[in-house]
Amino acid sequence: MANTTGRIPLWLIGTVVGTPVISLVGIFSYGSYSGLGSSL
């Protein structure tokens, strides 16, 4: 595997991008489960 991302490792990009996405999905899922998103 060639490092084509320059000085930024791919796992770091995945962590930075993935963490807020997982948090957002978790909050939405919890909201739907607790009844806040039942109107959707």
UniProtKB/Swiss-Prot annotation:
Record keywords, A-Z: Chloroplast, Membrane, Photosynthesis, Photosystem II, Plastid, Reaction center, Thylakoid, Transmembrane, Transmembrane helix
Intracellular or extracellular location(s): Plastid, Chloroplast thylakoid membrane
Please provide, in alphabetical order, the Gene Ontology terms of the cellular component aspect for this entry.
chloroplast thylakoid membrane; photosystem II reaction center
Q: Which Gene3D superfamilies match?
A: 6.10.250.2070
Membrane spanning residue stretches = 8-28
- Its topology with respect to the membrane? Single-pass membrane protein
Q: Name one GO biological process term.
A: photosynthesis
Pfam families in the record, alphabetically?
PsbJ
Q: Which InterPro entries match?
A: PSII_PsbJ (IPR002682), PSII_PsbJ_sf (IPR037267)
Give the main localization category: plastid
Similarity annotation:
Belongs to the PsbJ family.
> What does this chain do?
One of the components of the core complex of photosystem II (PSII). PSII is a light-driven water:plastoquinone oxidoreductase that uses light energy to abstract electrons from H(2)O, generating O(2) and a proton gradient subsequently used for ATP formation. It consists of a core antenna complex that captures photons, and an electron transfer chain that converts photonic excitation into a charge separation.
Per UniProt, subunit arrangement is: PSII is composed of 1 copy each of membrane proteins PsbA, PsbB, PsbC, PsbD, PsbE, PsbF, PsbH, PsbI, PsbJ, PsbK, PsbL, PsbM, PsbT, PsbX, PsbY, PsbZ, Psb30/Ycf12, at least 3 peripheral proteins of the oxygen-evolving complex and a large number of cofactors. It forms dimeric complexes.
Name by which UniProt lists this protein: Photosystem II reaction center protein J
Name the source organism.
Huperzia lucidula
